[in-house]
From Swiss-Prot:
Disulfide partners: none
Keyword Zinc tagged: yes
Record's keyword terms, sorted: DNA-binding, Homeobox, Metal-binding, Nucleus, Transcription, Transcription regulation, Zinc, Zinc-finger
Gene name of the record: ZHD4
GO cellular component: nucleus
Chief location bin: nucleus
Protein name as catalogued: Zinc-finger homeodomain protein 4
Gene Ontology BP term (one): regulation of DNA-templated transcription
Entry note about domains: The homeodomain differs form the typical one by having namely 4 instead of 3 extra amino acids inserted in the loop between helix 1 and helix 2.
UniProt-annotated stretches for the region Disordered: 1-22, 31-50, 281-309, 361-417
Biased composition (Pro residues): 368-417
Compartments where located: Nucleus
Protein role: Putative transcription factor.
Amino acid sequence: MVSILQLQTRTEASPASSASAAATRIFAVRRQQQEQEGEEEEEEFEFQERMDLSGAQGELPIPMHASAAASPFAGMGAHGGAGGGHVVELHRHEHVGNNGQAMAMASPPPTNVAVAAEQEGSPVAGKKRGGMAVVGGGGGVAVKYRECLKNHAAAIGGNATDGCGEFMPSGEEGSLEALKCSACGCHRNFHRKEADDLDADSCAAALRAAAGRHHHLLGPALPHHHHKNGGGLLVAGGDPYGAAYAAARALPPPPPPPPHGHHHHHQIIMPLNMIHTSESDEMDVSGGGGGVGRGGGSSSSSKKRFRTKFTAEQKARMLEFAERVGWRLQKLDDAMVHHFCQEIGVKRRVLKVWMHNNKHNLAKKPLPSSPPPPPQIPPMSMPPSPPPPQIPPMSMPPSPPPMPMPMPPSPPQLKLE
């Protein structure tokens, strides 16, 4: 009876052990393939770093092999057989279902591994590795390399380009020759990199197409989940560029700025004539006390000087004290100065500054002693001057009468017969 039970147990355990052994062999082969691919990627990346002489116009895109078998545990996810790296949920949700449905599968079906290997060898994967036309499958950024910017006259301090207008690879995509331009012979990094963002419609269409292509990699049907915050965004496709682009588009837009003139902070600005300034500049914020007020100053600047305001009584008392001590504080009068400052509520340093600022304006200047006025000399009386002698007018003799002029004799007249 015991032998029959042992035989039956071995018979029942044999299919499970054979399945686990097959899964182990599949994982071992897959790990070996991934190690070989990782070594090839490291060699290609090192070569690209050695060839990168310019360091300008962007960075070299590193080939990213993101497929269904990106992890040795491909197919073992929290969603029950979903291909690793193919479905990205961009929201938080709570799963409501049986624990058996949420558990991971014990081993992936061999068909998924075969399909993943076939997907890696497809032209789509080759396009991802090339990094020439499209970076990131399933919608992303189209990258083009335009004119060559290499300066061939840099050694002599000049600037000269070869005139190459567009990068043309020398070999097939994914090879080392593809990084060299067949037209000018320069590395691809010397050419200007141009990235064109695709619009939202084309990105959504590409995402849907990629989801349709990779639908057969998802395994069994996923259990239905209930979400508290509504439906999320599922990004299909095996590259991080498409996922990052979709994640950026799934984020909520920033709140619009408030309309102009509403919900803004009001700042009170006092006119200058409303601020009572005094003649003293206080260098310390804590200067003054009692009846000493503060000038209008901003609290944002800790180094701003505040002007101390004095009352009329304080000014009169300080003026009287300054005149009494001669507008100068001496060490011999420290006790008297301290007592006076306590009486009027002003610090000693503030009093000293006030006296220094107002010494030339408020100090009573003694008037210079004027000499006695000179004695007034009475004016001397002068005798009156005699009148000028009157000269009689001279009589002119009468003019003689004019003498008649004798007429000359007329010539004799001749008579004609």
